Amino acid sequence: MYAPKGIDESIESFCKKADVFKSFQVKVPEIFFRNDDLCHLIIEDFSDNLYQLNITQENSDIFIKSALDQLIRIQNIDCDTEIFDHFDLEKSIANKDLFIDFFCRGYLNLSDSSIPFDTIDEGYNFILKRFYELPLCISHYDFETRNLIYLDSKETGVLDFQDAMIAPYALDLASIFKDLYMVWDKTQVDDWLDYYKKNTQNEEI
């Protein structure tokens, strides 16, 4: 693993959060070697069984429920503000700006005069109001199929967690249920949500 200096996804953040995750039995890679000067880590190889490339309709129930088991452990981690930042309004607005830049301008090729900024703001503000009313917990922040690996032990390995932060609990659920690469029908999602609710240990949720 290579993490250049000066970016948010730092070696320090990865290692610190890896230790915290492991203490709550989250399946993250072992770190065998660290060199801050070279910006390198040697970490455990979790294999090539990446969710993004291997999940199907046939195995999705096993894969997703295994991922939810790991998510529940992540959400049990203490919200230590010395380690985890808050998913605050500034970050939310930054995500809205990414939507405008990459989707509206980049993908749809819209000019600024054609982008419905007021409608986007109205919809985003409505979502954020509901979003920030939800209970807070530790969020992976990228809990999607490209960052999950199904291990030989029948557990889910978790990668790319250096940006984990304190956020409303639904953030990671939305990431896995509304994945960028897979589309699940409502019946499946409802079943997985029931599984999550039955197994979560967070009484607020």
Residue ranges of predicted features:
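Hydrophobic alpha-helical packing residues
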Residues: 21, 74, 127, 192-196, ...
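An alpha-helical support segment within catalytic cores of ATP-dependent transferases
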Residues: 79-86, 90-91, 95-138, 200-204
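Active-site-proximal structural scaffolding
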Residues: 24, 67, 92, 141, ...
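ATP-binding pocket architecture of kinase catalytic cores
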Residues: 1-89, 93-94, 98, 105-108
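Active-site acidic catalytic loop and adjacent metal/ATP-binding pocket
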Residues: 74, 125-173, 180-187
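Active-site activation/catalytic loop segments of kinase-like enzymes and analogous catalytic loops
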Residues: 97-107, 169-204
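Non-membrane alpha-helical structural segments and their capping/turn regions in soluble enzymes
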Residues: 11, 61-68, 117, 121, ...
